[in-house]
C-alpha cells in the first residue's frame, strides 16, 4: 500500500486547519445585535431637513460607505436572523487566516510525488478532493460577512425620519420615485394586533444590468414571492398594482400584524458597489401613531411567528418605539414582510389618544444614488465633466471601470474614470459637451412613500353606542307592541 509522503501529510494537516478556521469564521458571525449603530461608529448627528444630502462627521467615510455597499448589495447571501449584524474580531481574524492556510496546504500538496502503486482509493483522487475542500472552506470562511443595514445612515443623521415637510428622509439618497401603497384596517381597539399591507411595486426592464434610458417610462409588474399578482394596464403596459384584499382584524384581546409587501420582478438585477450584477434588496420604514409598538414575543401567536419568518424589525431609535425600520433584506426571501404590532391603551399610556390617527410608510427597492456624505454612488448616470472629442476608451475588466480620454480644443487630453459597472453609450470619435450623459442609467430601484389613517376606538364609546342602539331598538319594539295593544282596545270598544 502506498504511503503518504511528508509534504502530503503536512498539506493535509494544514488543509484541515484551514477548514476549521473557515468554519469558525462562519460560526462567529451568528451573533446578532439590535443596536441602532455599531459601537465602533463615532458620529456627529446633524438633523437639518433642508439639507438634501446630510453631511455628518466621524469615523464613517465615503470609502467605508463604498466598501459597505460593495459587500451588502449581494442580498441573496444575507441569510440573517435580524437585519443588523455586527462583525466580531474572531470572525475577522478567522477569515484572514483561512486563505493563507489554504494556500500553504496546496503548496505542500504540490510537492508530493505520484505513487505508481494505487490502493483501493487513489491518493491522487484524495489529493484532488482535498484541494477542492480546502479552497472551498477557505473561500467560504473569508467571504463570511455580516449584512449591514442601510437605515443606519438615516438613524445617524436624523432624529426623526419624517421631515417637517412630510418627506421621509430615505428620499435624500434614493432619488428615483417609485409608488408605495399601504392598507390598514379602518379601526382597531386598544391592546389589539391589526394588519397593515404596504405595497412597493417595482418597475424596470429585465437584463444583465437592466439599463434604463432616462427618457423611457415603463410600467410596474408586481410579484408576490414568485407568483405575479393583479395589476392595472394602460395601452397594454402595466402601470400600477391592483388592491389586494386583506384579512379582517383579530379579536380585541389579540396582537395585530402589519404585512409589508414589496413585490418586484425577481429577474431584475442591480449594479452592486463593485460593479457586478446583484439581486435587489428591499427595505421599509413604518411610522406608527404615538403609542403603537412592536408586539411582545409572548403575545405573538405561533401562526404569526411562521409568517414573520425570522425577520426582525428594529426601532428607529431607543426613544421612538413607534418608528420601525427593516432592511436591506433579500427581496427573494422577504418579498412579503410581516411584523407583529400592538395598539396602545390611552387609559394607561397617556401619550396615546383615541381617534383617527395617521400612519406613514416608506419603501425602497435597490440601492440609492447618493451616500450620506453627499457623494454619488455608482448607481447613477455618468455625466462627462469636460467638453471635447473622445480620443480613447479603456476598460479595466478586473475593476469593471471605463477610462474615457477626452481631447479638448487646445489638444490637452483629460482622462475621466467612470463608476464601476457603468455601460457607455458613446464611442471613440464622438464629440461631447460638459455635463452630457455618456453612460446608461443602471438604476432599477427607487423609493416611494404613502400614508393612511387608522381609528383607535374607545371601548367606552363602542359600548355606549351598542347600549344606545339596544335602547332605540327596545323602544321601537315597545312602541310597536303598545300600538298593537291600543288597536286591540279600539276594536273592542267598537264592538260594544
UniProtKB/Swiss-Prot annotation:
It is found in: Plastid, Chloroplast thylakoid membrane. Its main location: plastid. GO terms for biological process: photosynthesis. The keyword Protein biosynthesis does not apply. Keywords: Chloroplast, Electron transport, Heme, Iron, Membrane, Metal-binding, Photosynthesis, Photosystem I, Photosystem II, Plastid, Thylakoid, Transit peptide, Transmembrane, Transmembrane helix, Transport. Pfam families: Apocytochr_F_C, Apocytochr_F_N. Gene3D superfamilies: 2.40.50.100, Cytochrome f large domain (2.60.40.830), Single helix bin (1.20.5.700). Its cofactor is heme. GO terms for cellular component: chloroplast; chloroplast thylakoid membrane; photosystem I; photosystem II. Translocates protons across the thylakoid membrane and transfers electrons from photosystem II to photosystem I. It receives electrons from the Rieske iron-sulfur protein and passes them to plastocyanin. Belongs to the cytochrome f family. This is Cytochrome f, chloroplastic.
